[in-house]
Amino acid sequence: VIKKCFAIILAFCFFFSTALSASSPQFPPIELWDQLNFVPTQEILDYLGIVPEEDPYEVRLIVPTDQVNDSFVTFSPTAYIRYIQEHGHYPSPLRSISIPGSTAQVSDSEVIQPSTQFEGRPNVLHWTGQDGEATWIVNVPEAGLYTIEVFYWMLDERGRDFEFELTINGERPFDEAGHLLLRHRWRDTHAITQDRRSNDLRPPQIPAFMWKSQTLNDTEGMTDGAFNFFFEAGQHEISFRALRGEIAISEIVLFNAPPLLTYVEFRAANAHLPVVPNIFITYEAEEALYKSDAMLFPTYDRSSALTTPYHHANIRLNTIGGPNWQFPGQYIQWVVTVPEDGLYQITFRARQNVALGMQSRRSLSVNGEIQFAEAAELVIPYNHNWVNFTPSDANGEPFLFALNAGENILSLEVVMGSAARTMSAIREILFMLNADYRRILAITGPNPDMLQEYRLDQQIPSLLPNFEYAAAALRAEIALIEAEGGDSGGETSIMERLATTLDMSVRDPDSIPRRLSDLEGAISALATYMLVLRSQPLELDKFYIHSPDAEIPRATDGFWRALWHQIRIFIASFFIDFSVVDQAEEGARAITVWYFGGRDHAQIIHMMATDTFTEQTGIQISMQLVQTDLITAIVSGNAPDVLINAERSMPVELAMRGAVQDLSVLPGFDEVRERFMPDAMLPYTFRGGVYAIPMTQMFHMMFYRTDIFTELGIEPPDTWDEFYEIIPVLHRRNMQVGLPLDQMRAPTMGEAVMVARAGLGIRNLFTTLLYQRGQDLFLPDGTMTTFDQDESVEAFVQWTQFYTHHGLPDFFDFYNRFRTGMMPIGVQPWWWYNMLMVAAPEIRGMWEMVPIPGTVQPDGSINRSSGTTGEGSIILNHTDDLDASWQFVKWWTSAETQARFGMELEMLMGPAARYNTANLEAFSMLPWSLQEQELLMYQWRWVREVPVIPGGYYVARNLDNAFRRVVIFDENPRDVLLRFNRNINAEIARRLLEFPAD
């Protein structure tokens, strides 16, 4: 009886509480909503009688589906795909309209000047500055879509492409017209040579200055072929606004070319040409005439004994392309010579083993013309081995190409072809799903309550229709890729995974919060897949011009040849030191130079030193690529003369022990000092001596999503006070803010040491906040920190409150969260700019880089001081030739050398590897646009270096410990900082006793 009564009471309480909660939902007081970042549900708003503001991210307001779609889930209404949908029904008149370059009206006559004659052509417009605008008047007799072709001569000797914005009648026709490129053409300076170890040396790449023409196209490869621009009949203004580069323009042409012939029509039109018999000519692909990019230099392959030229141990530059030849618009040209006019087959020994399961597409032109439609998109399938690829029709019948007797120019260009359709579809799906994902986050937050029913399908009426559309569109693209011969088991599995997640979400909307992490991962994977799809890598060894009956050499090794090849490589590994890039000749004046880094970097330095430094001074370089600890090498007597990239604290640590040379006493030091920012020598200065010359510097910039900020009606913060104001605006929508926080955690002791040696500069914002208050890290005599002073405590409190009071994440994936919009603003090192430009094409034009927020001073000015980090070049004390070592360091840190190294590095690895030189003049010579340079230089002038003192390593360690005590254990920040400061000062005092001043 007691049990039954107890059960009845419990049941009564349960039903009563349920009814009570249904009638009066539970929520905190309204005045605490902003402080707690509380997002009320629609039920709470209805209960309180509150009508939300009309805000696209205020998902408490139920927006009609059609309005949501128009605002969020499609491309920008001014994107090219929308432009063509609007104007695609207009004809493409088969006519040509020429506009002389010199007829332009210019905004700045000092940088843009007409010329009556230039390099054999009249009426040329010279554009010698990185800004300004030129406008041409054109009369179009017939309305329609026209392709625009520009005839130009590049003037920029640094090899920068000409970037510009195009407007028609004062308006940008579509978004992509805001960033157009006219490319350089490049060539090898000379044939491949060899070093003293019989390894091939890569020839430097230089611009080939000549007249060339290019149609305006999509630099991101989202659209296949040239852009079409709509013109009404009548007079129009076409304007170019320069963003970067220098150029001479002779002519602008509006035209439409007739459609390409099919292969059958081509054969019929060339029936008079014979199929030339008994011809077999081999050409090495690495011996190219011209290339569109400096990245397309000769490379090497030792995976096959059939790759020529061949050597089992030494480096032979015997291929071209690979990962460097993958972006739309990149081309390689060769000169081929045949004995007579006629029809020939062409076969390439090629390999596409980079993008798993993906095809590579190329267009093949002869003497500047694509001879038939099928040659406009040749598809090379994925294969991890070398293959012989002969362009053929769907039935495997090889194509014949018409060549003239004598020299012909053969060109292969990367094209997107049918993949452009998939790229556009994926971009639209990403645009839609990212917006839906942000709306879901605004309701659920990043960590949804699994027991709560969010009713997302009711709060976001467009959500399930969007998911259904996206899943269907993804499966349609998968089917098309499979039909075209793509590998359905490879990269397309990413599309299937996302489609499956969307299907399950549609079938069970209440499961969406549980699938949120899966959805985020699948969307990020699809964005990455778009990058993979955009890349079309292809490596070439050689190609053959031959008659149809010729026997083609096999492309892959037989078993015994491959086995012997691997045996020879294995034996050679016992006798060849692959860490040595090059050795000096015996008896020659020489120094040993170490580089901590990759072989490709070391080879660039060695190549530059050989053709400039050694050529000018006669001093030879023994270049070694090392990963060992320098201190161990010093103790063992195997240290180099010069280490060119010492970590931030290493020079002073070695100077304390008398192991490195004081450079300030050497001749010419004052001149060298002028190459850098005034503060740049500070971390390498110890007791009046300077022990390194700066090589690199890295500092913070702020990145934000312009599209999201515009939708929210907020501006990027200029001060930290404004920064605090936008945090709750973003948090109310469950968006995040990213600040740098690199704690001293590393999987190995060696990596932990490297983190410590990198210094405090950009590991977090503490030094930045400290410097913005006008405070230094240490007392002027370097015997104690300033952490017991009010300004330091205030900086520490502000730093920790970002995480304790404002809830900022301490660990995050900035790249993916910035792409999805989950983290629309962040302070990060400026190299993220290059990463986002290259690796996030789907948000191109939707974000900007600006200086970091500053602290308002008593006089109303804003202090934007920022910490920094970097590397420096040192000379070891034991060097036998101090003069030669000093000459090398001066040469290495000079503007010309640093700029060339940066350019060579970018040629090798692409724009994402933009070099962070510390040399001011060299920085201005790197391929930044004028706007990018101005932004970075503005912040760079605020950079303040952190000095290195005995025991200084203890600062970073204890700051990390203090940070964790405050953020994780909720201790008082002032007490914690003062407590750990005593430990720091004790260690500094101990080290000063160990390394006393003279």
Model-based region annotation:
Residues 574, 578-587, 648-701, 724, ...:
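Hinge/lid segment of periplasmic solute-binding proteins
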Residues 142, 340, 805, 840-913, ...:
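Extracytoplasmic/periplasmic substrate-recognition and gating elements
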Residues 781-811:
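Glycine-centered hinge/linker elements that transmit conformational signals in sensory
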Residues 22-26, 342, 430-652, 974-998:
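Conserved N-terminal structural module of periplasmic/extracytoplasmic solute-binding proteins
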Residues 611-679, 683, 707-715, 822-825, ...:
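Extracytoplasmic "Venus flytrap"/periplasmic binding protein-like
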Residues 852-854, 903-965, 993-998:
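Long, aromatic- and glycine/proline-rich binding clefts that accommodate carbohydrate-like moieties
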Residues 24-543:
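Extracytoplasmic
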Residues 686-695, 700, 724-785, 791-792, ...:
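Extracytoplasmic/periplasmic solute-binding protein
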